[in-house]
């Protein structure tokens, strides 16, 4: 008789994906972030569901309903802070996951990589709309500024913005539709993540050496199920420590003031995980140019498979590319810092230099480094 997990139609799918899946024997802790992102998504959907039970998407009562959740709902404060900081954890894991993909050449699995980029866009859209829902000062003005960027699109821009707003300013219609989209998008993300996994399992995982691992595979369970579980425990412990001791560290104090269309905050800025893109947007004086740069700052990831010139897949044995990779990481940290600073000297020029360096490393320096390394390493 066949084992149930190998014969039952549903369990067979789970078996092929998480139990009998052949996996490379040498994948490191950097391969844990896929499962951690799955954990983040589950945490966000669960906490978000409970928040949605008590939240009201109306401009008059939205801010009060969030205060009510924190004060009157049993453990509402905990659910709210888990959800708010869960978004930060989600993006930390996302950026580390993408960084791993760039460093070890995982982008050579083109379908998996491109669906990953779609997932990134979906997650960014979800996070942006979620930030609007508490209807604080930064929620309102962040929504106004970011949606207004679409007005830079020639000919249809103004009509498009009013269509998204559902009126002539960010108001009740905007809040209601943002709540609806914020609720549905995580389920679309979950479905897209399944497709992401489907394509990954067509090729199998990459590994730190960037070489085929068909000669040395091990079953996913128990080796990587336990390894992933350890990662989940460590990250959860750090996350809960953060939520319980420093819940407001990453938030903006302005969001504790109710939205007021008549009073603009001195510095409008998004959440920390969007600051690098916001800095690139602000570094170009032209509105349309800034919007194009903003979109390209993420879309440029799709060019990685096309710009791969090295004969080795991974950066593990390519010192010039390694140097450029860590310069890129440092550059992104500088952009994140600049995005949170006011638009005044010397921050303007630092942001412009960092933006140019960001695109230069990806589009020019890394491909050139690959060619140089081919020569040096006699490939």
From Swiss-Prot:
<comment type="similarity">
    <text>Belongs to the cytochrome b family.</text>
</comment>
<keyword id="KW-0472">Membrane</keyword>
<keyword id="KW-0999">Mitochondrion inner membrane</keyword>
<feature type="transmembrane region" description="Helical">
    <location>
        <begin position="77"/>
        <end position="98"/>
    </location>
</feature>
<keyword id="KW-0249">Electron transport</keyword>
<keyword id="KW-0408">Iron</keyword>
<dbReference type="InterPro" id="IPR036150">
    <property type="entry name" value="Cyt_b/b6_C_sf"/>
</dbReference>
<dbReference type="GO" id="GO:0006122">
    <property type="term" value="P:mitochondrial electron transport, ubiquinol to cytochrome c"/>
</dbReference>
<keyword id="KW-0813">Transport</keyword>
<dbReference type="InterPro" id="IPR048259">
    <property type="entry name" value="Cytochrome_b_N_euk/bac"/>
</dbReference>
<dbReference type="GO" id="GO:0046872">
    <property type="term" value="F:metal ion binding"/>
</dbReference>
<feature type="transmembrane region" description="Helical">
    <location>
        <begin position="347"/>
        <end position="367"/>
    </location>
</feature>
<dbReference type="GO" id="GO:0045275">
    <property type="term" value="C:respiratory chain complex III"/>
</dbReference>
<dbReference type="InterPro" id="IPR048260">
    <property type="entry name" value="Cytochrome_b_C_euk/bac"/>
</dbReference>
<dbReference type="Pfam" id="PF00033">
    <property type="entry name" value="Cytochrome_B"/>
</dbReference>
<feature type="transmembrane region" description="Helical">
    <location>
        <begin position="178"/>
        <end position="198"/>
    </location>
</feature>
<dbReference type="Pfam" id="PF00032">
    <property type="entry name" value="Cytochrom_B_C"/>
</dbReference>
<keyword id="KW-0496">Mitochondrion</keyword>
<feature type="binding site" description="axial binding residue">
    <location>
        <position position="83"/>
    </location>
    <ligand>
        <name>heme b b562</name>
    </ligand>
</feature>
<feature type="binding site" description="axial binding residue">
    <location>
        <position position="97"/>
    </location>
    <ligand>
        <name>heme b b566</name>
    </ligand>
</feature>
<dbReference type="GO" id="GO:0008121">
    <property type="term" value="F:ubiquinol-cytochrome-c reductase activity"/>
</dbReference>
<feature type="transmembrane region" description="Helical">
    <location>
        <begin position="320"/>
        <end position="340"/>
    </location>
</feature>
<feature type="transmembrane region" description="Helical">
    <location>
        <begin position="113"/>
        <end position="133"/>
    </location>
</feature>
<feature type="transmembrane region" description="Helical">
    <location>
        <begin position="288"/>
        <end position="308"/>
    </location>
</feature>
<feature type="transmembrane region" description="Helical">
    <location>
        <begin position="226"/>
        <end position="246"/>
    </location>
</feature>
<feature type="transmembrane region" description="Helical">
    <location>
        <begin position="33"/>
        <end position="53"/>
    </location>
</feature>
<keyword id="KW-0679">Respiratory chain</keyword>
<feature type="binding site">
    <location>
        <position position="201"/>
    </location>
    <ligand>
        <name>a ubiquinone</name>
    </ligand>
</feature>
<keyword id="KW-0812">Transmembrane</keyword>
<dbReference type="InterPro" id="IPR005797">
    <property type="entry name" value="Cyt_b/b6_N"/>
</dbReference>
<feature type="binding site" description="axial binding residue">
    <location>
        <position position="196"/>
    </location>
    <ligand>
        <name>heme b b566</name>
    </ligand>
</feature>
<dbReference type="InterPro" id="IPR030689">
    <property type="entry name" value="Cytochrome_b"/>
</dbReference>
<keyword id="KW-1133">Transmembrane helix</keyword>
<dbReference type="InterPro" id="IPR005798">
    <property type="entry name" value="Cyt_b/b6_C"/>
</dbReference>
<comment type="function">
    <text>Component of the ubiquinol-cytochrome c reductase complex (complex III or cytochrome b-c1 complex) that is part of the mitochondrial respiratory chain. The b-c1 complex mediates electron transfer from ubiquinol to cytochrome c. Contributes to the generation of a proton gradient across the mitochondrial membrane that is then used for ATP synthesis.</text>
</comment>
<protein>
    <recommendedName>
        <fullName>Cytochrome b</fullName>
    </recommendedName>
</protein>
<feature type="binding site" description="axial binding residue">
    <location>
        <position position="182"/>
    </location>
    <ligand>
        <name>heme b b562</name>
    </ligand>
</feature>
<dbReference type="InterPro" id="IPR027387">
    <property type="entry name" value="Cytb/b6-like_sf"/>
</dbReference>
<comment type="subunit">
    <text>The cytochrome bc1 complex contains 11 subunits: 3 respiratory subunits (MT-CYB, CYC1 and UQCRFS1), 2 core proteins (UQCRC1 and UQCRC2) and 6 low-molecular weight proteins (UQCRH/QCR6, UQCRB/QCR7, UQCRQ/QCR8, UQCR10/QCR9, UQCR11/QCR10 and a cleavage product of UQCRFS1). This cytochrome bc1 complex then forms a dimer.</text>
</comment>
<dbReference type="InterPro" id="IPR016174">
    <property type="entry name" value="Di-haem_cyt_TM"/>
</dbReference>
<keyword id="KW-0479">Metal-binding</keyword>
<keyword id="KW-0830">Ubiquinone</keyword>
